[in-house]
Amino acid sequence: MRQEIHPKYTEVTVTCSCGNTFVTRSTAGKKEMNIDICSECHPFYTGKQRIVDTAGRVDKFKKRFGGMKKI
């Protein structure tokens, strides 16, 4: 391999909004990352059905299109 053409691959501490933290490796260049959902709180892995609403997108959609008549 050619030297010094590849990005640095460092350890990163990832923190989920549910409070779960874990360490992985990344080329992102940050020491810490924040994520909205992880395997501890994702509905597929937990078996619990819920709507993952980031920043009120579902409410915004219902507000915008909820009053429309069916065609």
From Swiss-Prot:
PROSITE patterns: RIBOSOMAL_L31. One of its GO terms (molecular function) is metal ion binding. One of its GO terms (biological process) is translation. InterPro entries: Ribosomal_bL28/bL31-like_sf, Ribosomal_bL31, Ribosomal_bL31_A, Ribosomal_bL31_sf. Binds 1 zinc ion per subunit. Transmembrane segments: none annotated. Its cofactor is Zn(2+). Zn(2+) binds at residues 16, 18, 38, 41. GO terms for cellular component: ribonucleoprotein complex; ribosome. The keyword Transferase does not apply. Keywords: Metal-binding, Ribonucleoprotein, Ribosomal protein, RNA-binding, rRNA-binding, Zinc. Belongs to the bacterial ribosomal protein bL31 family. Type A subfamily. Part of the 50S ribosomal subunit. Binds the 23S rRNA. This is Large ribosomal subunit protein bL31. It comes from Francisella tularensis subsp. tularensis (strain SCHU S4 / Schu 4). The lineage of its organism: Bacteria, Pseudomonadati, Pseudomonadota, Gammaproteobacteria, Thiotrichales.
